[in-house]
Amino acid sequence: THEGEEFIYVLSGVVEINYGKNTYILEEGDSIYYDSIVAHHVHAAADNRARILGVVYTPY
């Protein structure tokens, strides 16, 4: 976790995002925006390859 906010856009593949106690599956063209202070982990789903565009804002 860290202060700030994040935006993730899936360019290709499938991405799994663990956010707090929730899990989200994003496919190509999907996006998500969240508060980074909540525990989170972003990874390609099912051991496949994925490409994302990530934008991270930190208040520093």
Language-model-detected regions and their locations in the chain:
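Short, conserved beta-strand element in jelly-roll/cupin
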Residues: 2-17
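Short secondary-structure boundary/capping segments
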Residues: 7, 23-24, 44
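Functional cleft and adjacent loop/helix regions within the main domain
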Residues: 2, 30-32, 41
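Ligand-binding loop in jelly-roll beta-barrel domains
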Residues: 27, 36-60
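Short acidic-glycine-tyrosine-enriched beta hairpin
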Residues: 20-35
